[in-house]
A protein has these predicted regions:
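N-acyltransferase acceptor-side catalytic subdomain
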Residues: 1-149
Length: 149
């Protein structure tokens, strides 16, 4: 039986567990890179990149993950959605905070929903992860959910 949760810091996760799921194909998804952003205070609440990573475990093994950040602005995304924020504001709706899956400060492409190679039903697991993240987005009352690059 698997369980999922959201974590506000990678310091709560073992680097070997994270990297086993990620593999070697995406260096910007590696634990060391993302955690360095946290440790250097580049990705935190003050900079508008509050980590809120999705992690699913089964038998103490990470079987899926998604790097997520609670964003209070659109800086450092390489997506220019300021007009969206302005439109929300004109209609009296808050655009921020939003929940975003991205690699901070870089437009690098790659997987955002990462599945352990042991997962058999890849499509089914991706749908489950997305549904879990959507439920959490509603629960924490963010305006929207974004997946970049």
């Amino acid at each position: 039986m698997s369980e999922h949760f959201f974590c506000s810091s990678l310091s709560n996760i073992k680097s070997s567990d994270w990297n086993e799921c990620v593999g070697n194909d995406h260096p910007f998804l590696q634990y060391e890179f993302l955690y360095a952003l946290e440790k250097s205070n580049s990705a935190n609440t003050k900079t508008g990149w509050q980590p809120y990573h999705y992690i699913e475990q089964e038998n103490d093994k990470i079987i899926s993950l998604c790097p997520l950040y609670i964003k209070n602005h659109s800086f450092g995304e390489y997506i220019f959605d300021h007009s969206w924020a302005d439109a929300y504001h004109r209609y009296g709706i808050n655009y921020y905070p939003k929940l975003q899956s991205a690699i901070p400060f870089t437009p690098v492409t790659g997987d955002r929903i990462v599945l352990n190679k042991s997962v058999k039903d890849k499509k089914g697991k991706q749908v489950q992860v997305i549904n879990n993240i959507i439920q959490e987005a509603k629960k924490i009352n963010v305006s929207s959910l974004h997946f970049n690059f």
